[in-house]
């Protein structure tokens, strides 16, 4: 999927989503092994279509998607700094590439992504059960965007949104599980990694009157071309339940009952004084 020209990805959207549906049938390892970067298969970097900027962005997107996917990870040496030629067992890796700023940025990205993965249990603690994963959106094939949630054993979660096209998505809305404020905590498009630096910041407020994807509220994001963002809820808003409105019929009925009760009560307690008889004259 990731090696396809972006124009054809919408016709192969199931290639990027299907693995999630059987990810919990066994305990899987997700390998990009030496077999994938040898014998004419190209390095991961050169599997990517487009110019050099798009190749670097695609590698960052792929590795971020891989880290967010359920299952344990395996990457062959050289992937972390975007080795350009195939692996050759007769020679060492092209460490000289690290003198190129773009490859050095790629190495820093791989390092930071690994640390981010280890520091956030939702990405690895429940890897082999549906309890650790939930879809938000998997069917937006026309824009080649997917979004899902990952959970740890305590119920803490991260939201992951992947944009697989070299197209900027402004105000791209997805369902949000809780009302409140969300924040972007990691982006493959950060400037320090060679990206554009587009960020959603730390104040992403929910649209509580815009339900989406089976959730009562939504958030809108700006997605850089060929990028992955990790989002979390930093402040939940407690919804106050409004008291149930009483119908006019019920209110009128209650008023009638009260009036009838008062009338009945008054009729039962009213007393009549006996009339005094006039004294008759004595003979």
Regions found by a protein language model. Give the residues of each.
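Active-site rim elements
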Residues: 45-57, 94-104, 215-220
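C-terminal accessory region downstream of the catalytic core in glycan-modifying enzymes
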Residues: 93, 98-107, 113-115, 173-207
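Aromatic- and carboxylate-lined catalytic core of secreted/periplasmic carbohydrate-active enzymes
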Residues: 98-133, 230
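A generic secondary-structure boundary signal that marks alpha-helix termini
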Residues: 115-118, 122, 191, 226, ...
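Acidic/aromatic-lined carbohydrate-recognition and catalytic surfaces
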Residues: 159, 171, 226, 281-283
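Intrinsically disordered, polybasic Lys/Arg-rich low-complexity tracts
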Residues: 237-283
């Amino acid at each position: 999927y990731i090696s396809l020209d972006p124009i054809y990805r919408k016709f192969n959207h199931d290639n990027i989503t299907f693995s999630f549906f059987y990810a919990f049938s066994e305990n899987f390892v997700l390998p990009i092994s030496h077999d994938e970067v040898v014998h004419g298969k190209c390095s991961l970097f050169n599997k990517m279509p487009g110019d050099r900027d798009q190749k670097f962005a695609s590698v960052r997107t792929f590795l971020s998607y891989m880290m967010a996917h359920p299952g344990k990870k395996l990457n062959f040496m050289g992937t972390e700094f975007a080795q350009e030629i195939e692996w050759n067992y007769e020679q060492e890796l092209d460490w000289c590439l690290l003198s190129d700023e773009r490859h050095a940025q790629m190495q820093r990205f791989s390092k930071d992504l690994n640390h981010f993965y280890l520091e956030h249990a939702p990405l690895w603690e429940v890897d082999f059960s549906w309890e650790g994963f939930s879809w938000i959106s998997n069917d937006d094939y026309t824009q080649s965007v997917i979004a899902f949630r990952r959970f740890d054993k305590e119920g803490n979660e991260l939201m992951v949104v992947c944009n697989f096209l070299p197209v900027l998505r402004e105000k791209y809305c997805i369902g949000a599980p809780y009302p409140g404020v969300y924040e972007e905590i990691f982006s493959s498009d950060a400037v320090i990694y060679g990206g554009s630096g587009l960020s959603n910041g730390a104040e992403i407020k929910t649209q509580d009157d815009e339900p989406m994807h089976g959730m009562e509220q939504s958030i809108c994001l700006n997605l850089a071309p060929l990028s992955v963002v990790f989002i979390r809820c930093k402040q939940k808003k407690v919804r106050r339940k409004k008291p149930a409105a009483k119908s006019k019929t019920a209110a009128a009925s209650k008023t009638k009952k009260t009036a009838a009760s008062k009338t009945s009560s008054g009729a039962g307690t009213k007393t009549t004084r006996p009339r005094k008889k006039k004294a008759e004259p004595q003979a």
